[in-house]
Amino acid sequence: MSTVYFPGCKYTIHSRVNSRKIRQYLIRQHGIRQTGCCSTGLDTLTAGDTAIFVCPTCSAFIQEYTPKNRSLSIWEILENDDAFPWPDCGSDRITVQDCWRSFDNRPLQDAVRRILQRMNVEIVEMEMNFEKTGFCGSSLMKTQSPRYSRFAPVRFIKNASGKFIPVPAEEQEKKMQEHGKQFTTDKVVCYCTGCLHGLRLGGVDAVHMMDLITARL
C-alpha cells in the first residue's frame, strides 16, 4: 500500500515550475510516490493505494475507473501541514470560484477554504458556490474528451447530458466576460485549470490555488 500523487497534466503544462515544487515537497515531507498522467497512471494503482489529485477531472477518473482506491485532494493533504511555508496574503479579499467537476466534493471545497484562511485571505463567496456551481470555464463549450467515456462515463456522459455544448471561440470569450461581471473582488482563486483559463479569457484576474500556495516553496 502506498500514497500516489497525480500531478495533473493540464496544471503541469500551466506551471511546470510550481508543479515540480509541490511534487518535490510531497516526496520530501510526506513520502508520497509520484506518477504521471492519470490516463496511464491509474492502471499502476494497486489494492490499498491512496490516490492524491490536484485536477478535478483526475478525481472523477479515479472514483469511477478505480473505485476501490481511496482518493483525496492535495488540499486535504496540505491543510493541516504546519511545516508548509504558507504565504501571508495580508487579508486580501479573494473570491472563490468552485468547479462543476467537483460540485459534490465538499471535503475538497472546505479544505480549499481552510487553506485560504491559513494564508490570511478574506474569502468572498459567490452565490453559485459549492454544490450549486455549474462552472468550468470554457471547457464546457468544447467537445468532450474521448477519455471521458472510458474513465468516467457516469459523471461526464450519463450525468452530463446537455452540459458540453461546443460554441465558437468568440462566443466563448463573450460568455466568460459575462460571467466575470459578477465578481466584486479584484482577484479570484480557483482549483481547476479549465476554470482558470475561462476566467482569464473573460478578463478576470484569476489565480490557481496551487500557484498561490507555492509562492514561498
Question: Predicted regions span which residues?
Answer:
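Iron-sulfur cluster-binding electron-transfer modules in prokaryotic oxidoreductases
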Residues: 1-217
